[in-house]
């Protein structure tokens, strides 16, 4: 929805009652060098495998790789801005980092409602991130408290 007076897109949520088991949402992003620099700066995580091309070539990655938590942040972004959206409180994330994400990779993060619990409006999501080749690079679960309204 757009606020016609300001031209700003308004983010809307899906409340706990509007979420059904099996519902899902997806966010797609392509990793850029500036994403890695911004994430390293924001997190203070300046491991040379993520920021120094020479070091990365000599290390296990062979080239600069994204911070694993970049994918985790994509999932948090998806849950907090799209599904369920504003009012969502992250309770936990349990993720497995199954593959590397490199500059130029396009990652599709998908969250799917696995279970709802009326107590506290808790929702458990299955989370999967795949690259442009369909290779799973992250999987796991996230639990949130969804908004009541």
Where are these regions (language model features)?
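Mid-chain, well-packed structural core segment of small domains
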Residues: 81-105
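Proline-rich low-complexity regions
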Residues: 48, 84, 100, 146-147
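Hot-dog-fold acyl-thioester-processing enzymes
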Residues: 2-88
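Generic structural detector for well-ordered beta-strands
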Residues: 26-31, 96, 143-145
């Amino acid at each position: 929805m757009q606020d016609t007076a300001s031209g700003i897109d308004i983010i809307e949520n899906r409340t706990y009652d509007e979420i059904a088991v099996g519902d899902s949402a997806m966010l797609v992003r392509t990793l850029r060098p500036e994403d890695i620099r911004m994430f390293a700066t924001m997190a203070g995580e300046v491991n040379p495998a993520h920021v120094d091309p020479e070091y990365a070539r000599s290390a296990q990655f062979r080239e600069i790789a994204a911070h694993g938590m970049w994918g985790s942040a994509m999932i948090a972004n998806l849950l907090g801005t799209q599904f369920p959206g504003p009012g969502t409180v992250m309770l936990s994330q349990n993720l497995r980092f199954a593959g590397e994400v490199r500059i130029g990779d396009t990652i599709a993060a998908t969250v799917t409602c696995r279970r709802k619990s009326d107590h506290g409006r808790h929702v458990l999501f299955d989370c999967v991130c795949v690259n442009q080749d369909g290779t799973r690079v992250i999987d796991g679960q996230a639990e949130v408290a969804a908004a009541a309204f």
